[in-house]
Amino acid sequence: MCNPPILDVCCGSRCFYFDKHDSRVLACDIRREEKIIGKNRTCYVNPDELHDFRSLPQDWENRFSAVLFDPPHFTHAGEKSWLRAKYGALEKDTWRDTLSRGFREGLRVLKPHGVMVFKWNEYNIPLEDVLACAPVRPLLGAETPKTSLTHFVVFAKDGATKARDGLCILRPQRIKDFCALPFAWQGQYDVVVFEPPMLSAPGWTPGAWQNDLTLALAECFRILRMNGSLIFTWKESEVPLEAILKCTPEKPVIGNRLPTKAKRHFLFFMKLPDDGVSQKQWELF
């Protein structure tokens, strides 16, 4: 893809990608290297372009429909450790400034009403302290229990919070209410947030929840504008991720690959023209 609509400002080894060679994403990092740790571990960091997320090119302003921001989260990692090789590391005295600059730059290169998907692990630094570095309030976050340290948080440029801002948040009590949205909504939204009800809630077709979810997700894509973002979050962690992927009309860009640990599925999609990619090509586990 000549002009990818999604920018990953610090791709690392692309751990949360469903396709590590996704042409929809311009993957950047400050380093390009291959490290062998011990006898059996090899870490590849091979971005499309080398950039520092604290200072992105000036001519990228308002260029991207979505930004992925998964910065290093360790402040204590050995110089030759596997953790530093795979995830990188922040300086314990300057991490606030580093993340603040990263947030500002990520939002700067977003188009109006674009979204930034931020991923964080609280191994060393609490999420609350990290969010204090952001210049805007988050739009939403994937709730996780105390046993999970990983969080997905979504920011919208220009503080989009309402339908007039191109935002649609859908949390229906009955899935059937979501399978046939108003026709006039077609192509109206830049961002759709979809959180289906639990399978124990009324309204699901007995024994056919995948059909219901397929119809609902198709409606989500229908009401999106081209290059619009779909945020899918669902508490049904007992449902295998593979089963959900069979219901999606397009391949996800990134997501929570281990929902049983976080007790919630989180997937990020973007509406694009059909790229001819079959399901078997992108279900990479």
Predicted regions and their residues:
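Class I S-adenosyl-L-methionine-dependent methyltransferase catalytic core
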Residues: 1-285
